[in-house]
């Protein structure tokens, strides 16, 4: 008799994805972050659902409702901080996941990579809208500044911004629609994750060597299920340490002041996970140029498969490319730091140099390194 998990129409799908899935025997801990992102997504949806039960999306009561959740709702404070810091964990895992894909050449699975890019944009949009909901000073001014960037689009820009705002400024209509979008997008993300996995399971996982592992596969369960559970426990440990010991470490003190359209904060800045893109935006003096650079800083990932010049897939055996990859990581950390600094010397110059280096590394230096490595190996 066939095992029910192999014959039942629904269980068969689960079985082929999480139990009997053939997986490479040598994938390292860098491959854990996909499952950790799944854990983050489930946790964000659950905590978000409980927050939505008590939150009101009205400009007069939004700030108070968040305070009410923290003060009066049973364990409301931990749900709120798990949700806020869970977003930070989500982005840490997301950036490591993308970095792993870059390092090991996983971008050659073009469908998986492209769906992943759509996912990245969607998660960023969701996080941005979520930051607006508490209706603090940084929520209001962040929403005003970032949505205003669309006015740089020629001809239709101003109309587009007012259409998004639902009026002539960020107000009640904006907050209500942002709440609606913030609620629906995670479910769209979940559907995209299913598509992402569907495409991944068509080809199978990559591995650190970058060569085919068809001759050496092991079942996903129990080997990688136990490995993923360990990763999830470590993630939850890190998150709980953050939430229970310093929940406001990654937040902005300005967001504890209710939104006031008549009072601009001294330094308007987004959450830490958007600072690298914000630094690129600010490093260009022209508004439209800045907006294009901002979009391209993420959209550039779409061009990476076309820029792959090496005969080898992974960077494991390519020391020049490895050096450039870690320079790129250091550059992104520098941009993140600059994004949080005021617009004054020497930060302006550092930001501009780091922005030029970011695009140069991806568009010029890494493809050239691939060609040089081919020549060295006489390939």
Curated annotation (Swiss-Prot):
- Relay the cofactor remark from the entry: Binds 2 heme b groups non-covalently.
Q: Which GO terms describe its biological process?
A: mitochondrial electron transport, ubiquinol to cytochrome c
Q: Which CDD domains match?
A: cytochrome_b_C, Cytochrome_b_N
Record has tRNA-binding as a keyword: no
Quote the InterPro entries the UniProt record gives. Cyt_b/b6_C, Cyt_b/b6_C_sf, Cyt_b/b6_N, Cytb/b6-like_sf, Cytochrome_b, Cytochrome_b_C_euk/bac, Cytochrome_b_N_euk/bac, Di-haem_cyt_TM
What topology does it adopt in the membrane? Multi-pass membrane protein
The coenzyme or cofactor needed here is:
heme b
Q: Where does it localize? A: Mitochondrion inner membrane
**Sites where the protein binds heme b b566:** 97, 196
Q: Does the keyword RNA-binding apply?
A: no
Transmembrane segments in this chain: where?
Answer: 33-53, 77-98, 113-133, 178-198, 226-246, 288-308, 320-340, 347-367
Q: Which residues bind a ubiquinone?
A: 201
According to the UniProt entry, its GO molecular function terms are: metal ion binding; ubiquinol-cytochrome-c reductase activity
- Residues that hold heme b b562 according to the record: 83, 182
- Taxonomically, the superkingdom here is Eukaryota
Write down any Gene Ontology CC term: mitochondrial inner membrane
Subunit-level organization: The cytochrome bc1 complex contains 11 subunits: 3 respiratory subunits (MT-CYB, CYC1 and UQCRFS1), 2 core proteins (UQCRC1 and UQCRC2) and 6 low-molecular weight proteins (UQCRH/QCR6, UQCRB/QCR7, UQCRQ/QCR8, UQCR10/QCR9, UQCR11/QCR10 and a cleavage product of UQCRFS1). This cytochrome bc1 complex then forms a dimer.
More about this protein: Heme 1 (or BL or b562) is low-potential and absorbs at about 562 nm, and heme 2 (or BH or b566) is high-potential and absorbs at about 566 nm.
By sequence similarity, the record places it as follows: Belongs to the cytochrome b family.
Purpose of the protein: Component of the ubiquinol-cytochrome c reductase complex (complex III or cytochrome b-c1 complex) that is part of the mitochondrial respiratory chain. The b-c1 complex mediates electron transfer from ubiquinol to cytochrome c. Contributes to the generation of a proton gradient across the mitochondrial membrane that is then used for ATP synthesis.
Protein name, as recorded: Cytochrome b
Q: Which organism is it from?
A: Camelus dromedarius (Dromedary)
